Amino acid sequence: MSTKPTINKDELVTLFSQIGLDSSKAKETTNNATLSSNLQEIIKEAGAESGCEKSVGLLLYTLATKYPANAMKHRATLVDYIANKKSVNSINLQACLDYLRRTANEELNVAEFEQSCGVGVVITREQVAQAVSDYINKNKSDLLEKRYQFNIGGILMEIKNSLKWANAKDIKEEVDAAILSLLGPKTDADKAPPAKPVKPTTPTAVATTTAATTTTGDLSPIIPAELKPAKEEIKFPDPSDNIQNTPKLLADHLKTTGGKIVTRFPPEPNGYLHIGHAKAMHLNFGYAKKNGGKCYLRFDDTNPEKENQEYIDSIIDSVKWLGHEPCEITYSSSQFDTLYEMANELIRRGYAYVCHQTASEISEGREKMTDSPYRNRTVEENLKLFEDMRLGKFEEGKAILRMKGDMKHPNPCMRDLIAYRIKYHHHPMSGDKWCIYPSYDYTHCLVDSIENITHSLCTLEFEIRRLTYNWLIDVLGLYRPVVWEYARLNLTHTVLSKRKIITLVQNKIVNGWDDPRLSTLNAFRRKGYTPEAINLLCDTIGVTRTNGTTISYELLELCCRQDLDGKATRAMAVFDPIKVVITNYPEDKSEEINAPNIPSKPEKGTHKIDFSRIVYIERSDFRMEDNKDFFGLAPGKEILLKYAYNIKCEKVIQDADGKVTELHVTYDKDNSSKKLKTIHWVSSVAGTEPMKAEVRLYEHLFKDSEIGDDWLNNINPNSLRIIPNAFIDKTVLASKEYDRYQFERVGYFVVDKDTTSDKMVFNRTVSLKENKEKSKSRN
């Protein structure tokens, strides 16, 4: 067991800095009591209290974060290998950890350990160069044909597989040099993006794979450098390598599961899912699907005060919308009988007791590491009192069941956490059968074990709870899943906290849980995002254990544009219209112009739009004075109305204040002039006005990208602008909710649920990426 550090934080920062951690990493480490204690012990074992080489120190730090808890008796040996430079390094350290985890209960076979983990194996630069040369010669014809479009990553992977203990940097440098020698520097053709395939390819997954029915492909080539997320290559252990307290536990588990991967997505039904949950779904469902396993949708419904059927239904709908298919929908509440019996068994084994302290007394005791005065009751007394709790003989808060861990433990989660509390509330699934409900810390791990979960994947804030998770399962003698934590998804310009979202809704800062300015999946759906776009974001960012990483909202928008570009039918809309009269076009004439549904996909067909003597253009597409950077219309200037005719401005009509009210133009039906600037427009049948619709232009809800503690004062007052009477062409007629369009030169829009038979309503999903350049040209 780790001991509590006996030196203060400043001294710890100094100690950790002496082994090579930078100051910020050293300070961050001291905030994690378990990691800090582990690292302090390892430094002592290594004899590095006065410092060491940075390369050694970083290996010791990695050891503190990753060393398997079941193999503590071998830790000092591995520390000695590192401290005395016995050929354990960053290349083979993970192999060492994996070996010790598998053989934790055995005496260390040094020869087998060193052979299995590459200890003492040295791959020279010359060996790397020879392996690269052999590969290049073997694949020379393909390389010469495809040049820099050849999968260079495949070369690196194959060389690494053949030279397992080689330095990855050496491999990369030798491959780069060999490719340059064979092909020479990149030409302009080499730098061009590869041709798009006829059918989209499945994105390369990092520890997961997209579970939606379709995918948009790999975004890597088009992501700007400043938006590229840091991915980590994650390799989870096989179910058969999951060390248990007894071989029988593992054998029984493997017999039940057939050795397959079993994961779960376990939301609490106390609100609507947000985009952070999309990442959790993507990892859990995707990892199981990729490996031929299964994933449960499990509701952790242990708090009846905050849960209701509306949230359950919404969560099921969101999971299906994202394309995930749970093997079964389960509820922690369906295990209440089993959990109750396990609690009694916990009492019988001396690991739980009924406590009557108040919440503040419990908090103080855990902080000061002092025992509850009720901690040493007899088993018989605790069993009777727990039964009295179940029978409703206590008021809420007057009695709780606590797990008897270790009140002196440096990890606060081991200090007698609550297992059961009294709540006289109706439960959406179990009704009024129970008045005692298990806590998350008690329920989560036990239901994982009951459902034979192989990989319990949680966000990093639960890392501190891993010790309690394993402890509770072990003292009850149950099967123990692998627990692995990853960084949660953080997104700029928005909040993902359920508490904060509730505040926004209740204070009517937004219009409900599906307001398009929120981060809920319902909100993104209403805003027009597709499940494929959200899954593409999850696939693009992958998984990482680096906490505090925030993903730019722009990357999400990039994923959305990438997906909608090939799906959204084009239409034209004018938000701030100027009337344009084509003076040489017959007054009573109307015609229909053919326009492509999706210009890049001719197979998607065309649609017809009305054209007559009166058309409308955007006010921002006209200027009294022209310049070379302006794409729009000006006096005496000729431009092209997209898909229609060239027009030339002959006359400008203004009101008393100088505001332009009407333009008179002439058109060239033969479009004699070529390569003119092009603008969008809207018209209608002669003698009628174009269709009108309400358009809602959404911006970020918060002014700053990083949302601080003063978040309510950071609300963007201009996060919603409504265009009540925009002109839109007839393409959108007969549309239904969630139908998506690209309004040409403007952005992507979706039909909102507020649409009626009298008036359509559109929400802006995302602007076109060229909007920034366009706005510059109009200034």
Swiss-Prot record:
<dbReference type="InterPro" id="IPR020058">
    <property type="entry name" value="Glu/Gln-tRNA-synth_Ib_cat-dom"/>
</dbReference>
<dbReference type="Pfam" id="PF00749">
    <property type="entry name" value="tRNA-synt_1c"/>
</dbReference>
<dbReference type="InterPro" id="IPR014729">
    <property type="entry name" value="Rossmann-like_a/b/a_fold"/>
</dbReference>
<dbReference type="GO" id="GO:0004819">
    <property type="term" value="F:glutamine-tRNA ligase activity"/>
</dbReference>
<keyword id="KW-0547">Nucleotide-binding</keyword>
<protein>
    <recommendedName>
        <fullName>Probable glutamine--tRNA ligase</fullName>
        <ecNumber>6.1.1.18</ecNumber>
    </recommendedName>
</protein>
<dbReference type="Pfam" id="PF04558">
    <property type="entry name" value="tRNA_synt_1c_R1"/>
</dbReference>
<keyword id="KW-0030">Aminoacyl-tRNA synthetase</keyword>
<dbReference type="InterPro" id="IPR007638">
    <property type="entry name" value="Gln-tRNA-synth_Ib_RNA-bd_2"/>
</dbReference>
<feature type="binding site">
    <location>
        <position position="459"/>
    </location>
    <ligand>
        <name>ATP</name>
    </ligand>
</feature>
<feature type="binding site">
    <location>
        <position position="440"/>
    </location>
    <ligand>
        <name>L-glutamine</name>
    </ligand>
</feature>
<dbReference type="GO" id="GO:0005737">
    <property type="term" value="C:cytoplasm"/>
</dbReference>
<keyword id="KW-0436">Ligase</keyword>
<keyword id="KW-0648">Protein biosynthesis</keyword>
<feature type="binding site">
    <location>
        <begin position="488"/>
        <end position="489"/>
    </location>
    <ligand>
        <name>ATP</name>
    </ligand>
</feature>
<dbReference type="InterPro" id="IPR000924">
    <property type="entry name" value="Glu/Gln-tRNA-synth"/>
</dbReference>
<feature type="binding site">
    <location>
        <begin position="268"/>
        <end position="270"/>
    </location>
    <ligand>
        <name>ATP</name>
    </ligand>
</feature>
<feature type="binding site">
    <location>
        <position position="300"/>
    </location>
    <ligand>
        <name>L-glutamine</name>
    </ligand>
</feature>
<dbReference type="InterPro" id="IPR007639">
    <property type="entry name" value="Gln-tRNA-synth_Ib_RNA-bd_N"/>
</dbReference>
<dbReference type="InterPro" id="IPR011035">
    <property type="entry name" value="Ribosomal_bL25/Gln-tRNA_synth"/>
</dbReference>
<comment type="similarity">
    <text>Belongs to the class-I aminoacyl-tRNA synthetase family.</text>
</comment>
<dbReference type="InterPro" id="IPR042558">
    <property type="entry name" value="Gln-tRNA-synth_Ib_RNA-bd_N_1"/>
</dbReference>
<keyword id="KW-0067">ATP-binding</keyword>
<dbReference type="InterPro" id="IPR020059">
    <property type="entry name" value="Glu/Gln-tRNA-synth_Ib_codon-bd"/>
</dbReference>
<dbReference type="Pfam" id="PF20974">
    <property type="entry name" value="tRNA-synt_1c_C2"/>
</dbReference>
<dbReference type="Pfam" id="PF03950">
    <property type="entry name" value="tRNA-synt_1c_C"/>
</dbReference>
<dbReference type="InterPro" id="IPR004514">
    <property type="entry name" value="Gln-tRNA-synth"/>
</dbReference>
<dbReference type="GO" id="GO:0005524">
    <property type="term" value="F:ATP binding"/>
</dbReference>
<dbReference type="InterPro" id="IPR042559">
    <property type="entry name" value="Gln-tRNA-synth_Ib_RNA-bd_N_2"/>
</dbReference>
<feature type="binding site">
    <location>
        <begin position="274"/>
        <end position="280"/>
    </location>
    <ligand>
        <name>ATP</name>
    </ligand>
</feature>
<dbReference type="Pfam" id="PF04557">
    <property type="entry name" value="tRNA_synt_1c_R2"/>
</dbReference>
<dbReference type="InterPro" id="IPR049437">
    <property type="entry name" value="tRNA-synt_1c_C2"/>
</dbReference>
<dbReference type="InterPro" id="IPR020056">
    <property type="entry name" value="Rbsml_bL25/Gln-tRNA_synth_N"/>
</dbReference>
<feature type="binding site">
    <location>
        <begin position="496"/>
        <end position="498"/>
    </location>
    <ligand>
        <name>ATP</name>
    </ligand>
</feature>
<dbReference type="GO" id="GO:0005829">
    <property type="term" value="C:cytosol"/>
</dbReference>
<dbReference type="GO" id="GO:0006425">
    <property type="term" value="P:glutaminyl-tRNA aminoacylation"/>
</dbReference>
<dbReference type="InterPro" id="IPR050132">
    <property type="entry name" value="Gln/Glu-tRNA_Ligase"/>
</dbReference>
<dbReference type="InterPro" id="IPR001412">
    <property type="entry name" value="aa-tRNA-synth_I_CS"/>
</dbReference>
